[in-house]
């Protein structure tokens, strides 16, 4: 079911803008005393659980827990990949280690493109492996998405007047890059039923039966 990663900067920026607008709107409601649970729902992801032990051995990391699970993504891989790249950007810029994520029980999921050997390694090190993207079209688009996220959040180059800072000014929020990073971190880490000043991002998850 998989195809290569093909999101352009336009699609990446649209997702970032939607998330920040939602977080800003929710924050302003919170400071007005409106505290009902809210969450931003991404378009559905359709998946099938992988139960073949031999396939799992090839997919899961060697240090994976015994009860670790893996899923074949039927629909939604572009969104999941972009969210993964965004999260990798955030933890890199905020100097958050893998050990800290495990301690906080918010360890990032892993992605492997069956059509691209080495995709999981490339994604795990994205931002530090630009030389590898020139010979692989999927890696090129992934690297471009990472670069777009960086420019948009920092509001530089083509996003100087139409990046995250301009949205924050519109909603009377801090335009410091560190504060914008924290908004996205809070948004992605928040759970649906727990209070958060910026709300929560959730994914509708549809599971297909093995025989479908």
Give the residues covered by each predicted segment:
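Glycine- and hydrophobic-rich flexible loops that cap the catalytic core of alpha/beta enzyme folds
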Residues: 1-212
